[in-house]
Amino acid sequence: MISAAAFSHSASRGSTGSRRSANSRHSASSRHSAHSRRAARSWRDAKSRRLAVASLLTTSALLLAACGDESPASDETSNSAGASAGSAGERRGEAPATEQAVGLPLDAPRIQVLSTGTGERKLLSYNDVSSEQAVDIEVSEGFQQLVMKNDQLVTEAPELGDLVTTTLPVAGSVLVPEGFTDSTPGADSARHVDFRVRDPHISGIKTSTSSADDAGLNAAGLAEEIASADGFGFGWLAENNGQLNTLLLAAPQQAGDQARAVVEQSLTKLVSTPVIFPDEPVGIGAQWSVDSRVTGEATMLQTTTFTVTDISGDEVKLDISVEQRPALGALSLEGHAGAEGFADDTLNVTSTDTRSRGSLTVDMKQPLPVAGELDFTTRVVYGNDDGAASVVQDSSTRMRFSSAQ
């Protein structure tokens, strides 16, 4: 359990002034712990971006020089360990000891009702305090950068490509927030959702012979190391409508660095598209949008649209669509070898397109969806007026939920 006593606040760049003020009241040790974790994440993100840009520019040079060599063959390794079924209590069992929990403040989203639907209308909200849940979650991600000649440019987002899937069998409960100080972002939230990951595993890992050493990745090793993240604690402080105020993370003391990074990234992706309900009654066919900011290979502005397809007691079925656009309007190649292939060191966003589909079943007495899947791929194209080619970035996400039996 992530308790208030084991909580350390880590400020995020987008936090409000009050949150920054709250952070300033934390102890030096909490600030140091949070700073260390942010530094580690920033280092990993920076390294990932450097490798990605280097890979992109290498591809650019080959394309612009009309070289058609194919990439080295890839090896794929997966951990075949299956998710263990059982109740929330059985899953939690004797979990490994975790480090001090870190809290990441989340920006408040903007919710807009597009239609209240037809027939009988109902105010939808979570009523899950004191409940327990066991659910299997699959978080799949893919990212690709390539260069296309402008006369062959395709701006439409493709279907899902190669994905790395992290499977997270989780179990937990919902509590009334207690023991958090006023300096904790979201301390006055209505709900404290508290989960543990049990028996995580990963599949779909691919590394080429040319990039594996630079990336510091070993497919077989990571598939084995992910087991060290067993018992990873996570949760959030949230409102009854589903709005998340603070993400809570507590890595097991035994977890390896790569295992921590993989699970952290998957959990961050998980909370990037929460089911948030509007503050007015809705019926069948109702639609509302949620605007938020999400991070990943690049920071994106995201609009998630929910459509009610059925309401039966506490169960709500939703169709979901996602649209994304980059928060930054340009990509800088300055200082990178291979940038001479472009007419300018700065490439502007020329188009953005998202292909998405999804449907989720939500039990309002449970904090996570009990069934369903959400898939989306966003293609962002960067270019300039005088260039012969454009940089294309594709980022894909798939999330699946199924209740444990």
Positions of predicted regions on the chain:
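Short, structured beta-strand/loop micro-motifs enriched in basic residues and often containing a Trp
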Residues: 264-273
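Acidic, serine/threonine-rich low-complexity disordered tracts
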Residues: 68-213, 286, 290-405
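Bacterial N-terminal signal peptides that target proteins for export
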Residues: 5-16, 24, 36-55
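C-terminal motif of bacterial Sec signal peptides marking the signal peptidase cleavage site
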Residues: 63-66
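N-terminal acidic, proline/glycine-rich, low-complexity intrinsically disordered segments
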Residues: 1-9, 69-71
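Hydrophobic alpha-helical segments and helix pairs
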Residues: 220-262
